[in-house]
A protein has these predicted regions:
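Context-gated lysine
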Residues: 9, 28, 54, 97, ...
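Glycine-rich loops and low-complexity Gly/Arg-rich segments
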Residues: 59-62, 117-122, 198-201, 261-264, ...
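Surface-exposed beta-strand edges and their flanking turn/coil or helix-capping segments
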Residues: 47-51, 56-58, 107-109, 189, ...
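Alpha-helix capping/hinge segments and adjacent helical runs
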Residues: 240-282
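Extended beta-strand/loop cores of jelly-roll/beta-sandwich
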Residues: 1-174, 280-292
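Functional-site microenvironments in short loops/helix caps that host divalent-cation chemistry
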Residues: 141-258
Length: 292
């Protein structure tokens, strides 16, 4: 911890979905880190351990009928999963929360804001419609904060530029895809850390109902390592790769495509194949990171 200039806060016991870990919480520059012990684990997925409940089976059957798929559920799911393998993961300090990339919080009277009266004119229009936020794509974002507004300026970055800035500014890096799978699933053999399907009692992003108001989002709560990870398929978490590589989400493709909760959240499985992109352009609204 001293080597990375981390300040020890406390020991804490995390427990979730049948796995638990007592470990140290640390702080650096306003960020919370947790010490994740290493382990030798099995990663990847090829078949059900518990099997799906009736609700998940019916949801899949409806989609199979729609796309005229005649194979088994396991065959269908296996196509998008990494192969089963044994991996040894080294211990690491891990940022507890997902963070946005390329957004700089600035005061409303920042000269870079006031130099654009058209932004403020548009903001006034939106404010009049009782809107909570207003964004100009990859340029600026405003969010209501009580009676006032907060502003962020966007600084688009490429994947290599971001990796360099992470190293220089935080002395940190991105987790590898295998490390990410371990942080997310802890070596679980089921499709998700809690079982072989979606628990429909959970409050999920993009599938809320009236009864959920005021409740926390279940998947966003700290897992057995104390991490908030893979809880929103619209968020793609950057991992280490030769070109831009992400885990934990698909930018909302399945949800937006009307595939329903189960397939919508499948990209959040710890076993899902990482998405490798050729362009190296970070999409500020969707791509997020955690330092390790």
């Amino acid at each position: 911890a001293t080597r990375y200039h981390l300040t020890f806060k406390e020991l804490y016991a995390f427990s979730r979905w049948g796995q638990s870990c007592t470990t140290g919480l640390f702080e650096k520059g306003g960020r919370e880190f947790v010490f994740v012990p290493g382990d030798t684990v099995i990663l990847g997925w090829e078949s059900f351990v518990q099997g799906m409940d009736k609700a998940n089976q019916e949801e899949l059957a409806d989609i199979f009928a729609e796309i005229e798929y005649e194979g088994s559920a396991e065959e269908f799911l296996r196509q998008g999963m990494t192969p089963v393998r044994q991996v040894t993961i080294a211990p690491m300090f891990v940022g507890r929360k997902l963070e946005e990339i390329g957004w700089e919080s600035v005061p409303m009277n920042d000269p870079r804001i006031t130099a654009h009266p058209d932004w403020l004119e548009n903001l006034q229009k939106w404010a009049g419609q009782n809107s909570q936020s207003f964004e100009i794509h990859e340029t600026v974002r405003f969010e209501r904060n009580g009676d006032s507004w907060r502003a962020w300026l966007c600084h688009p970055m490429t994947y290599p530029e971001f990796q360099r800035s992470l190293l220089w500014e935080l002395a940190a890096s991105l987790p590898t895809p295998d490390e990410w799978a371990y942080l997310c699933g802890g070596g679980c053999r089921t499709l998700f850390p809690w079982g072989d399907g979606l628990d429909h009692k959970m409050k999920l992003h993009h599938f809320e109902n009236g009864e959920d108001q005021g409740k926390p989002y279940d998947m966003e709560q700290p897992n057995f390592f104390g991490l908030s990870i893979a809880y929103d398929p619209y968020k793609r978490e950057l991992v280490d790769g030769k070109t831009l590589t992400t885990c934990g989400g698909d930018g909302g493709c399945n949800v937006c495509g009307g595939m329903g909760p189960l397939l919508g959240y499948l990209p959040c499985s710890p076993h899902r194949k990482p998405e490798v992109r050729e362009d190296n352009e970070i999409h500020n609204g969707y791509d997020v990171f955690r330092p390790v």
